């Protein structure tokens, strides 16, 4: 909106620069989240929209009165900042907003069910995965129709591994959406544990998206160019800004949780950025914390079903370390450090090819 008005109509050249509009979007989303979140917290407490706490984690029972669904606020702030600062005629921007809203809506349904039933179960797995699958499939098909190439790239290599057939690519992208959204959802179990790794991952992906959309940088760095994708940089930075605003209230001890409304939206948008920038494989490194958390659950369930033995004291693995006596803050900060280092290594792949 501001972009179309100030650059398209008044011809203010400053608004033609992605970096300026992305920075502006960052601060708009940050301050809007800071402003709206206290009001949301008061409303959520009045409505008793509190996060049901699992009985298997007795140390978290003191969090039972903490309101949830804070993700609605930072998703809303991101959309407002994107509408103001990004070009809404860009399909990658529109699809990014659709991903944020769609995945957040599924998360909202799950949160609402948990609050109504006063347990941690939420929607049935069949309904939840069904809704996520349909949404992921629609976005993946639209990306294919847009003409996004289907080459599969590996980090630190100049050339793609191979070109996927269209149907295989769509199926692969759906898998990336589903796995990433649920991985972030599993990670969101401690104060700030999902927020900061998401910030690191989004910052890294934002750089890749910016390079992919810039003809000179992509040529210099031997990075695959994706026409028009650079505009998504504005939306990504807006989401990072809103996450910093959310973290202001989510740091330990948290005043609000993001809920599935936030974690599914984050995971879906991270997956979307990875797909359009051809970083599906590198996402394993950038989202290392999410991968480890998910693997711990898979291994725990698999081990118990096959051997009747548990590999960890509790899964996801952040609870395992809590059971071993680590303070919550120690688990959180150490996971942040791992995430930061993983993303620094991932960024090296831009130059080391």
Swiss-Prot record:
GO terms for molecular function: metal ion binding; phospho-N-acetylmuramoyl-pentapeptide-transferase activity; UDP-N-acetylmuramoyl-L-alanyl-D-glutamyl-meso-2,6-diaminopimelyl-D-alanyl-D-alanine:undecaprenyl-phosphate transferase activity. Pathway: Cell wall biogenesis; peptidoglycan biosynthesis. It is found in: Cell inner membrane. It catalyses: UDP-N-acetyl-alpha-D-muramoyl-L-alanyl-gamma-D-glutamyl-meso-2,6-diaminopimeloyl-D-alanyl-D-alanine + di-trans,octa-cis-undecaprenyl phosphate = di-trans,octa-cis-undecaprenyl diphospho-N-acetyl-alpha-D-muramoyl-L-alanyl-D-glutamyl-meso-2,6-diaminopimeloyl-D-alanyl-D-alanine + UMP. HAMAP family: MraY. Catalyzes the initial step of the lipid cycle reactions in the biosynthesis of the cell wall peptidoglycan: transfers peptidoglycan precursor phospho-MurNAc-pentapeptide from UDP-MurNAc-pentapeptide onto the lipid carrier undecaprenyl phosphate, yielding undecaprenyl-pyrophosphoryl-MurNAc-pentapeptide, known as lipid I. This is Phospho-N-acetylmuramoyl-pentapeptide-transferase. The lineage of its organism: Bacteria, Pseudomonadati, Campylobacterota, Epsilonproteobacteria, Campylobacterales.
């Amino acid at each position: 909106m501001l972009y179309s008005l100030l650059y398209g109509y008044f011809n203010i050249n400053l608004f033609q620069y992605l970096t300026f509009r992305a920075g502006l979007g960052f601060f708009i989303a940050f301050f809007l989240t800071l402003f709206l979140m206290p009001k949301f917290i008061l409303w959520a407490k009045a409505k008793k929209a509190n996060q049901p706490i699992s009985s298997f984690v007795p140390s978290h029972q003191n969090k039972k009165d903490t309101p949830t669904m804070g993700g609605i606020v930072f998703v809303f702030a991101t959309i407002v900042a994107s509408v103001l600062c990004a070009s809404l005629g860009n399909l990658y921007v529109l699809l990014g907003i659709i991903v944020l809203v769609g995945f957040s809506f599924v998360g909202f349904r799950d949160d609402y069910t948990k609050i109504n039933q006063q347990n941690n179960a939420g929607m049935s797995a069949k309904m939840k995965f069904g809704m996520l699958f349909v949404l992921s499939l629609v976005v993946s098909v639209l990306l294919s129709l847009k003409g996004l190439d289907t080459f599969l790239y590996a980090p630190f290599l100049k050339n793609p591994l191979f070109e996927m057939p269209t149907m295989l690519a769509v199926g692969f992208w759906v898998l990336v959406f589903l796995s990433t959204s649920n991985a972030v959802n599993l990670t969101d179990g401690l104060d700030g544990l999902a927020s900061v790794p998401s910030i690191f991952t989004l910052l890294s992906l934002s750089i890749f998206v910016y390079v992919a959309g810039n003809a000179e940088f992509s040529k210099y760095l031997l990075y695959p160019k994706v026409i028009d994708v650079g505009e998504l940089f504005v939306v990504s930075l807006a989401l990072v800004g809103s996450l910093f605003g959310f973290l202001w209230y989510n740091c330990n001890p948290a005043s609000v949780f993001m809920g599935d409304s936030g974690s599914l939206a984050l995971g879906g948008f991270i997956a979307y950025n990875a797909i359009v920038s051809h970083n599906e494989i590198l996402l394993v490194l950038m989202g290392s914390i999410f991968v480890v958390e998910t693997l711990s659950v898979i291994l725990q369930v698999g081990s118990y079903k096959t051997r009747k033995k548990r590999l960890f004291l509790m899964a996801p693995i952040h609870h395992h370390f809590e059971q071993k006596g680590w303070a919550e803050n120690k688990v959180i900060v150490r996971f942040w450090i791992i995430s930061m280092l993983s993303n620094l290594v991932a960024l090296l792949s831009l130059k080391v090819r």
